[in-house]
Amino acid sequence: VSLADCTITKTGSSSNTENGDFYGMNAALLAENGAQVTVTGGEVTTSATNGNGIFSYGSGTVVNVSGTKIRTAERNSGGIQTTGGGKMNAEDLDVQTEGNSSAAIRSDRGGGTVNVKGGTYVTNGTGSPAIYSTADISVSDAVLTANNSEGIVVEGKNFVKLTDCTLSGKMQGTYNDDSENIQCIMIYQSMSGDADVGEAYFEANGGEITSLAGDMFYVTNTSCEIKLSGVKFNMADGVLLRAVGNSSSRGWGKSGENGGDVKMTLTDQTVEGDIVVDEISSLDLDMSGSVLTGAINADNSGGNISVFLDENSTWNLTSDCYVSSFDGDISNINAGEFHLYVNGEMVV
């Protein structure tokens, strides 16, 4: 099916939120059961709960959409949504969502593959990041703006890769006052069954990421790999990464056992900010041709923390730091008035 320069409008209400989130009920355009759909230009508008703009559901389903304007007004209404193993290819879209739980680039149970090139993606509701990933999502040359939420959320064994994107997140407060952190990018495991349990992956190459409130990265109840190269970071509160457990009040694992285990790789990356790791979490930091200005485990309460600096990397301390192991040349650490402790021993 091919649609060119069409206007699609969806009104009404939803009888079942999960059917809308998982299977596309109430979407303006739903492709399923192996359908092949191409949408070019035109406008998609919804004013219904679960009024996702364009929805790809099921293995073998492919949606190609380009140059389309998408507007959604109510909750649980993403701009483009992919679930159940579907595929979405989007280029140069103009997407804006207003409701809560309405990511501009949205996925849910069963995931799939999403490729986005160019375009603008804006969200205005709470719990509405520009990208919510329970899928494999790659985005290049796009502007991603979350005005009342994190910029990106990765749940479970899924990934987000950004190339030359401009991202900003402005989480105004904790959801219903029951969240424990404010951040720009969250990587976690919810235990809801919407995402497979396993290592999450986030990668950013080039572009700019701005946190207008809270930490840059927050990792809890999961393991993940974060790769950063040539990104310009603008920090809100001075914390680059917070890998910690949570109270489990929202079902995110068992308290005391739900930390964040992070492997972070910096390649040709300059960044300023602290790294916080609690006693049930861990960090493996690998720096190549990079500069980090900040403290790691300044309060000496973290779990296993290893740091590797290659000969072309520099670590500028902003406080006393405590790590389990260090691999590199001590001369590449600018300590100033501070000290680095490795396994309890002061080395600089």
Language model: regions and residue ranges:
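Glycine-rich beta-solenoid repeat tracts in large extracellular/virion proteins
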Residues: 1, 16, 25-33, 52-58, ...
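Hydrophobic residues embedded in beta-strands of well-ordered beta-sheets
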Residues: 88, 137, 159-160
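Beta-strand-rich solenoid/repeat architectures in extracellular/passenger domains
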Residues: 2-24, 36-50, 61, 66-76, ...
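Extracellular beta-strand/loop-rich repeat segments of large surface/secreted proteins
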Residues: 276-348
